[in-house]
Amino acid sequence: SGFVKYVYNHFGISIERICRDQAQGGRKISKSELKPGDLVFFDTYDKNGKLNDISHVGIYIGDGKFIHASTDLHNKIAIESLSSSYYSKRYMCARDYISK
C-alpha cells in the first residue's frame, strides 16, 4: 500500500496509505474493466480458504499482470499475473482512481 501511495502521489493523485482504505476510494470496477493504473486488491491471509479482508494491493499494468511490493521478496517490487494460482484465489476487487 505504501508503494501504491508513492506511485500515485508521483503522478499527482492523492490516495490513502492503508490498502483497506484505498479499496474504499475511486470507482469500483469489475475485473473485465481493468486497465493500466487501476488498483487490484487481495486477501493474502489464509483463513481456511475464505476471503475475509483486504490485506494487499497492486497496480494493474495490463495483459493480466500487476506490480506490487512483494512481502515474500522482502518488499521488493515484483510483477505477478492475476491468473497465478496464488493471486487468482485471493483476488477481491478493483478500483479506478484515474478515470473521471
Q: For each predicted feature, which ranges?
A:
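Aromatic- and glycine-rich peptidoglycan recognition patches
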Residues: L51-K100
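Short, Asp-centered acidic motifs that coordinate Mg2+ and/or phosphate
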Residues: L39
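Catalytic cysteine-centered active-site loop
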Residues: S1-P36
